[in-house]
Amino acid sequence: MDHARLIESLVRRGIIKTEKVRRAAERVKRELFVPERYKEVAYEDIPLPIGDDQTISAPHMVFIMNEVLDLEEGQLVLEVGSGSGYHAATIAEIVAPSDSPPSRWGAVITVEINPRLASLAFENLSKAGYSSRVHVVNADGSSGLPLRRKVDRIVVTAAAPQIPPPLIEMLADGGKLVIPVGSPGFWGQDLLLVEKRGNNIIKKHITEVAFVPLRGRYGWS
């Protein structure tokens, strides 16, 4: 399958629903974010290994999460689990689109606990032209980051035993967080949408999922 056919398939299946998510999917080439030996299958709708028992998520899961997040231009987004950088790039094309003036851009901060993968994500994002819109941090993302402002959106790309309290604390009022919660194995996991409204935290089940386990203080290790 090629890039265009993958996107057509995701639209036809109702995975990609909005024009902004479709536009981002079209602009980001997944082949730039997969290991060389997997480039021939870069546009198959499957997860692919990137080393250290980690994967790049299947495209349908990336865009399900992006749709649920309700991303908008100008937002500040935190990603926990950089992987190869692909998901962060697709978010950047919505909050800081390449055809929009930089004065209107938001930004993506992607946090990766694995030093090798943090370097991989940085390298891939730089080569693909996202270094001014996506900032890679090698740290324990489950513990949050000491930022000067609250973030509008958070996406966690690995399964946690529970929603990490520091991430709730980082969310702005009206902010949204998407996170897989459940077993460290590839079963018994639920994708949750969490909304912060004043002192209230509202949770909504989206679908059942299968993610690698989250590492860190509020993860599985």
From Swiss-Prot:
GO terms for biological process, alphabetical: methylation; protein modification process; protein repair
GO CC terms, sorted: cytoplasm
Domain of life: Archaea
EC class name: transferase
Catalytic activity: [protein]-L-isoaspartate + S-adenosyl-L-methionine = [protein]-L-isoaspartate alpha-methyl ester + S-adenosyl-L-homocysteine
Enzyme Commission code(s) on record: 2.1.1.77
Keywords attached to this entry: Cytoplasm, Methyltransferase, S-adenosyl-L-methionine, Transferase
Molecular-function annotations in GO: protein-L-isoaspartate (D-aspartate) O-methyltransferase activity
Main location: cytoplasm
Gene3D superfamilies: Vaccinia Virus protein VP39
Localization per record: Cytoplasm
Active site (UniProt): S57
Cross-referenced Pfam families: PCMT
Family statement: Belongs to the methyltransferase superfamily. L-isoaspartyl/D-aspartyl protein methyltransferase family.
HAMAP family in the cross-refs: PIMT
Entry function: Catalyzes the methyl esterification of L-isoaspartyl residues in peptides and proteins that result from spontaneous decomposition of normal L-aspartyl and L-asparaginyl residues. It plays a role in the repair and/or degradation of damaged proteins.
Protein name: Protein-L-isoaspartate O-methyltransferase
Top-level taxonomy: Archaea, Thermoproteota, Candidatus Korarchaeia, Candidatus Korarchaeales, Candidatus Korarchaeaceae
